[in-house]
Amino acid sequence: MAEEIHGFRYRDSRDLTGFIDGTENPKGKARAVAALIGEEDRPFAGGSYVAVQRYVNDLERWRRLDDREQEQIIGRTKRGSVELPKKIKPQTAHISRVVIEQDGAELQILRQSYPWGTVCEAGLYFAAYTKSLDAFDLMLARMMGTTGDGLHDRLMEFSRAVTGATFFMPSLESISSLKQ
């Protein structure tokens, strides 16, 4: 084993920036719709693509910002996790970059993340489950500023990805069929 990272729950599902993470996650049956490949791709139906990343946060620099500045970077209120109104939410806010509508529908992923930390560094371990890697790839491109619109996610000025991988997770039905 080259690396072992331990995540933990922090306060009321907040990450180490102090914001609640996963506020916009799909609920109920919408979770499966976002995360599981459907019958339109029968050989892979019931499976999911999983993208994982470990971010290191510059928390010392982040904590020098006041709450209002942090809220402008995230696009939500720190206390109640309420999305800022469009007229005051910057286009470079994290929420502005990752909430994407295509053909009148919001691209969905199911996200799960945990804060992690050592004596020397700390950040967020992130996993996205999705029926289409295109949604995750576009969110990531918009965060990193590679979509050609001249914008990037300001949160990336305080956070850097140090690891990342993408996997396909087959359905239990597919795995069971391998035994036969």
Model segments located where?
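Long, histidine/aromatic-enriched segments associated with O2/redox biology
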Residues: 1-180
